[in-house]
Amino acid sequence: PVVSISGDGGFLFTATELATAVEYGINLVTIVFNDNRHGNVYRQQKEWFDGRFIASDLHNPNFVDFARSFGASAEYVETPDQLRSALERGLSTTGPTIIEARQVRDLPTPWQYIIEPPVRGPHAVDRQGGSAK
């Protein structure tokens, strides 16, 4: 089996591929952490654009009902123990399983260690290390 972990916004980009997973009986467990937000977009708008937010909040479907409408197994969890049990069930299920896990907003982010913030103005440098033009 394959385990996929994504946020709600990222999952929605390709959620209809669930139909293919059901059709071919692909053993896939997808954990969707749902905070009703494009978290990375929101974070960038907050940090890089002085909190000017646009199109970062989501109005999501019920992911359990959504998955079941394709014929996939699905369940909703609220605690780490429930997630562990749901993952074990999903790994032993034939075909795809969606696990929706509610997530609180504004959790600490690792992005400050992963990506550099944008630089604008006279100190901007292009990707090859030269001066901005």
Language model regions located:
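Thiamine diphosphate
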Residues: P1-K133
